[in-house]
Design a protein with these regions (language model features):
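Surface-exposed, charge/polar-rich loops and edge strands
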Residues: 1-41, 45-178
């Protein structure tokens, strides 16, 4: 089965540095097939016979720790499941508008997106939109006023940031086609 691993918080402001070519090699050496990486933010596509995504995430965390000596949260989703999720996107999400920033927030096991949403609170209605779908939340906000958006302020705070990983609409569209 084809999967996507989304690593949380790597290669940001010089922290948690992971080389994508080295990560690709590590995945391949540990038995994953047809490994590809996309961008420097920790997007890894791979194939494996395992069907338990929790086991896959644990295996990947162990590979990262063994190879890079970093404890990195990992979200795993099948490529088909991600395609299905994107097909359920609300009409306001994923537009080509340069004024709006479209993201998908994934809750990393064992957390649920409902728990994350409860901790963050209501979105700022005039600045951002949120719609929960499965264990993810479609989220869009005004680029110019992002600092005032409630979800923007809280997604990186302690107690919430480690529960999630976020990707843009454009990144996810590219990944599902790889």
């Amino acid at each position: 089965m084809r999967y996507i691993a989304l690593l949380r918080g790597i290669n940001i402001s010089g922290k948690n540095k992971i080389s994508m070519p080295e990560l690709k090699i590590a995945f391949s050496e540990k038995g994953f097939a047809d490994v590809k990486t996309y961008l420097n933010s920790g997007n890894v596509l791979f194939s494996d016979d395992e069907t338990d995504i929790v086991k896959l995430a644990e295996r990947i965390r162990a590979i990262i720790f063994e190879t890079f000596h970093l404890e990195i949260p990992v979200f795993v989703i099948s490529q088909d499941e991600l395609k299905g999720l994107l097909s359920k996107a609300p009409s306001w999400w994923g537009s080509d508008s340069k004024d709006i920033y479209d993201n998908l927030i994934f809750a990393i096991a064992p957390y649920s997106i409902e728990t994350v949403a409860e901790k963050i609170g209501e979105p700022s209605s005039e600045l951002e939109k949120v719609e929960i779908c499965g264990n993810a939340a479609f989220w869009a906000f005004d680029r110019k006023l992002y600092a005032k958006a409630n979800w923007w302020k809280k997604t990186a705070t302690p107690g919430i940031g480690e529960m999630i990983t976020i990707r843009t609409a454009n990144t996810l569209r590219k990944i599902v086609e790889m």
